Amino acid sequence: MATKTTVQKAIDTTSTVTPLGTLLKPLNSEYGKVSIGWGTTGVMAIFMSLFAVFLTIILEIYNGSLILTDVTLQ
């Protein structure tokens, strides 16, 4: 039976504890919890504004490279 084999394989596999998993476990334990008040909204707003500045700088560099000087069209 395919189902019995699959279930048996799932039972036989054992999980291993890794240092990275141990390090990241506290982050996973906060899953589903809601922060009081605004939470990390302020941090998110700061990073969004920094990203907008970054995109603006990239756009300015790109637009500056498109300007062709001393080119005449006939």
UniProtKB/Swiss-Prot annotation:
| Bilayer topology term | Single-pass membrane protein
Q: Which Pfam families match?
A: PsbH (PF00737)
Q: Does the keyword Chloroplast apply?
A: yes
GO CC terms, sorted: chloroplast thylakoid membrane; photosystem II
Task: Show the GO MF annotations.
Answer: phosphate ion binding
Q: Give GO terms for biological process.
A: photosynthesis; protein stabilization
Q: Which InterPro entries would you find in this protein's record?
A: PSII_PsbH, PSII_PsbH_sf
The portions of this protein that span the membrane are 42-62
* Keyword ATP-binding annotated: no
Q: Using the record, list the residue span of the signal peptide; answer none if the entry has no such feature.
A: none
Keywords assigned? Chloroplast, Membrane, Photosynthesis, Photosystem II, Plastid, Thylakoid, Transmembrane, Transmembrane helix
Subcellular location per UniProt equals: Plastid, Chloroplast thylakoid membrane
Which Gene3D superfamilies has this protein been placed in? Photosystem II reaction center protein H (1.20.5.880)
The source's superkingdom equals: Eukaryota
Query: What quaternary arrangement does the UniProt entry report?
Result: PSII is composed of 1 copy each of membrane proteins PsbA, PsbB, PsbC, PsbD, PsbE, PsbF, PsbH, PsbI, PsbJ, PsbK, PsbL, PsbM, PsbT, PsbY, PsbZ, Psb30/Ycf12, at least 3 peripheral proteins of the oxygen-evolving complex and a large number of cofactors. It forms dimeric complexes.
Q: Which family does it belong to?
A: Belongs to the PsbH family.
Primary role: One of the components of the core complex of photosystem II (PSII), required for its stability and/or assembly. PSII is a light-driven water:plastoquinone oxidoreductase that uses light energy to abstract electrons from H(2)O, generating O(2) and a proton gradient subsequently used for ATP formation. It consists of a core antenna complex that captures photons, and an electron transfer chain that converts photonic excitation into a charge separation.
Q: What is this protein called?
A: Photosystem II reaction center protein H
